Amino acid sequence: MKPVLASTLHDPQNRLESLINEQTPKLEELFHEKIVTLSSSTSRETLQTLKKLGYEASYGDKSVASTYILALRRATEKKIEPIFYCDFDRLLHWTSHYPEELEAVTQKSTHDFTLFGRTKRAMLTHPETQTLTETTAKTLASKVLGFPETRDVLGTTWMLKAQQAEALIRAKISNQYGFYLDWPIRLWINSTNPGYIEVEGLEWETPDRYQQEITQAGYDAWKENYQNMQEWKKRNLMLRDMIEAIATHIQFNKST
């Protein structure tokens, strides 16, 4: 059976409307149901576009984690498995640039939980504010999980069962961003047959929103907007929260 899509989207300026319209026919072929939960600041136009196209779309609360939780909860209510979670802007980029890859990974699964990570090439498309801080978190998480090499635990893309999603919904959220790492660790530890797949389609999706600005300024100059001090502070805050989440699992392992 086709999976249920559980997804979240933050788009305050409705920049992705044309891409949503273009790519929805492809997504309709891949997913049995399409659920998208929006951040509280996402534009009303985006909500209207999604509903018009047949998505089950609604707003989440102000916290980032609550938006993810609502998407997973609505997916579990469908009583259909598996559930495929991917941030919606990433999914739009994936299906527009690597449609065959997306179709392949969504239509066949031999694991009760599949963690999707970025290939080395896909990871390097992101700005250093992201690659450098995430490398620290991924290295620590990979050691906690006993991987022989560092894996991209932060792709925030998973194929999972409803029972696993329900466990995430019940899990305690201890800080703002730690769930990005806490959840995949929990899913992997509590799965009987977990799998890991690296994909090209999870390359950096943000440029899709800013094609006009990129055309005017040039790609390298535009990308510098994500290398400023404000962005470094944001990414370091995320890293701090994720390290706290990892510490919880290290303490748990020691106690057992």
Q: Could you tell me what each predicted segment is?
A:
Residues 10-29, 42:
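Short, well-formed alpha-helical segments that are part of the catalytic scaffolds
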Residues 51-66:
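Conserved donor nucleotide-binding strand/loop of the catalytic core
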Residues 69-82:
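Active-site nucleotide-sugar/metal-binding loop of Leloir-type enzymes
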Residues 110-152, 165:
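Short, flexible, basic/aromatic active-site loop/helix in glycosyltransferases
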Residues 177, 181-256:
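C-terminal catalytic/acceptor-binding lobe
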